Swiss-Prot record:
GO molecular function terms noted in the UniProt entry: 2-C-methyl-D-erythritol 4-phosphate cytidylyltransferase activity
Sites marked Positions MEP for the nucleophilic attack: R159, K217
Protein name, UniProt field: 2-C-methyl-D-erythritol 4-phosphate cytidylyltransferase
Catalytic activity annotation: 2-C-methyl-D-erythritol 4-phosphate + CTP + H(+) = 4-CDP-2-C-methyl-D-erythritol + diphosphate
CDD domains per the UniProt record, alphabetical: CDP-ME_synthetase (cd02516)
PROSITE patterns linked to this entry: ISPD (PS01295)
Organism: Corynebacterium diphtheriae (strain ATCC 700971 / NCTC 13129 / Biotype gravis)
Protein family per UniProt: Belongs to the IspD/TarI cytidylyltransferase family. IspD subfamily.
Site feature: Transition state stabilizer: R17, K24
EC primary class: transferase
Length: 244
């Protein structure tokens, strides 16, 4: 039996930096909410067997009505809602607990990366299916990055060694669960800012695959303006063809 690929779409945050009246995941982009776009991309990727949308309990009725209205509960693959926790890491753990499989591939995706190409999603999933325990999509860094203490520069890492990390990040579910349990039990003196950094701490090699400029995160009004400019020009249908 082939391994299932389950996508966790994180949509439980408030996203206050966007300055919208709704939580960020539900903000429309050309009339289509960000979370709807993200779920559609997972379905279109042709590698995902189930989508779990992680929401805040307060948004249960709204989210259920939204996904129903957009026909996502009657999609070709199952789509369901799971309540998240206070922080993103808590929400991811809630999502992992909702998956019965012990050998699945799990993709963890920010709903705010609403224009992520389905082909990139497939690329991440296939790299995990090929035997890698942790896979992240990355793009080169355009700016020079400085390490600072206070207001003083203390180092300039070589730009050629730096990458910006996107989502979805892909994992062997057993390995990711083990890393989460160890992190919760040991409470190390560092904050795992993404799931890959947790796996790094746990000692799991993390493979990088090519990301995509379209997978940018809609966090600020400027990000939203960029996403709107892209979709106002033309819906990015060219990106909806999964890669080989």
């Amino acid at each position: 039996m082939s391994r299932r690929v389950v996508a966790l779409v994180a949509a439980a945050g408030k996203g206050t930096r966007l300055g919208a009246d709704l939580p960020k995941a539900y903000v429309p982009l050309r009339d289509i909410p960000l979370v709807v776009r993200s779920v559609r991309a997972m379905i279109t990727s042709a590698v995902v067997d189930e989508v779990i949308v992680i929401i805040s309990p307060q948004m249960q009725d709204y989210a259920a009505a939204l996904l129903l209205r957009w026909g996502l509960f009657s999609a070709d693959i199952p789509v369901r809602l799971v309540h998240g926790g206070a922080e993103r890491a808590d929400s991811v753990w809630c999502g992992l607990q909702a998956i019965a499989d012990t050998d699945a591939v799990v993709l963890i995706h920010d709903s705010a990366r609403a224009l992520t190409p389905p082909g990139m999603i497939a690329r991440v999933a296939r790299a995990v299916l090929d035997g890698n325990k942790a896979v992240i999509p990355v793009v080169p860094v355009a700016d020079t990055i400085k390490t600072v203490h206070g207001t003083t520069v203390v180092a300039t890492p070589p730009r050629r060694d730096l990458r910006a990390v996107q989502t979805p990040q892909g994992f062997d579910i057993a390995a990711l669960r083990a890393a989460n349990i160890a992190y919760q039990q040991q409470q190390p003196d560092f904050e795992a800012t993404d799931d890959a950094s947790l796996m790094e701490w746990f000692g799991t090699p993390v493979l990088c695959v090519d990301g995509d400029p379209m997978a940018f995160k809609v966090t600020t009004p400027l990000d939203y303006a960029l996403a709107k400019a892209v979709t106002d020009q033309a819906e990015p249908t060219i990106f909806e063809v999964p890669s080989d």
